From Swiss-Prot:
Gene: galK
Site residues (Transition state stabilizer), renumbered to this chain: 28
UniProt organism field: Erwinia tasmaniensis (strain DSM 17950 / CFBP 7177 / CIP 109463 / NCPPB 4357 / Et1/99)
InterPro entries: Galactokinase (IPR000705), Galactokinase_bac (IPR022963), Galactokinase_CS (IPR019741), GalKase_N (IPR019539), GHMP_kinase_C_dom (IPR013750), GHMP_kinase_C_sf (IPR036554), GHMP_kinase_N_dom (IPR006204), GHMP_knse_ATP-bd_CS (IPR006203)
A GO cellular component entry from the record: cytosol
Class of the enzyme per the UniProt entry, highest EC level: transferase
Keyword ATP-binding applies: yes
Protein's name in the database: Galactokinase
Amino acid sequence: MSLQTTTQQIFSCAFGYAPTHTVQAPGRVNLIGEHTDYNDGFVLPCAIDYQTVIACAKRSDRQVRTIAVDYDNQQDIFSLDEPIERHPQQLWSDYVRGVVKYLQQRAADLGGVDMVISGNVPQGAGLSSSASLEVAVGSVFRQLYQLPLSSADIALNGQQAENQFVGCHCGIMDQMISALGEKNSAMLLDCRTLDTRAVPMPSDIAVVIINTNFKRNLVGSEYNTRRQQCEAGARFFGQSSLRDVELAEFAEREHELDPLVAKRVRHVLTENARTLEAANVLARGDLARLAVLMAESHASMRDDFEITVPAVDMLVDIVKTSLGERGGVRMTGGGFGGCVVALMPRERVASVKAAVEQHYQAESGLKETFYVCTASAGAGLC
């Protein structure tokens, strides 16, 4: 049964009437551009065909009533006329409440809503299940109450909810691609200006995501350390962010920098350049050049930014050996585990999957999870 049918049926059973709208917002994978977002740089994500779906309808009062199908149909009810606080037990409720809290500050004409939520974005895999939920909830209120908000506003609202209400620090990429993605396209996002450009993806290219299932444990503390090192690098060059540092200037003064900071700066500067080139290369279907750029990105994350782990490097090598020049592969996400992303002709998917099944578990002791995705549309009615 589809998510759409499931949420609609549970809505009718639980609330005693049929939903008027069903909304979806997708998860995402970042094809290239890692740890560039908080340095005001460039990223190249695409939305994927895993999403959060919400069956919904207006209420005549000021209550927001929500059922989370994936959490044993837990319910949450709160009022728009009272201060919106965190839920004492249910973390999923905080994402809903946070989105609604900041929507109220952006648009006065909100009213009550009934919602039933379900999703199939894998949680904990770095595919942005939380951003998908935030954008879906924002889109519900925007649709039902015709709020004068853009898709970018919905994305920024979701980021604010996650940062300030839930308390998880995140950049803007995840919400922007979930809100603004286009079918069969990636999106080049300038994280400083929030300007976007759709990058058409050749129809015969598959987006393959493979979860290493390596348990990440350093990601929080190491993320903060990398961020501080990047800020130190920007200060050294007298800039507010590494976005404004030129590679030539870095090359001239690299020897003056702390060696570790220099490695971090080199990654960000070269990754920005790779991301801009990758957008052009992808649009013209040059998989051979894309493979080189993705390989350089992974090597930079491994050697200069030092955020990969042996299981990730092993999986990348297995896929790379199987693909040759017929596609690219790299780690994606914050690092220290998580997923790798590969772009390849659809006819190569089966042989890559077979190679991974043959070698990865035998060499790492871990069993991968394999997702074959399509670049999908951002949030909207379904």
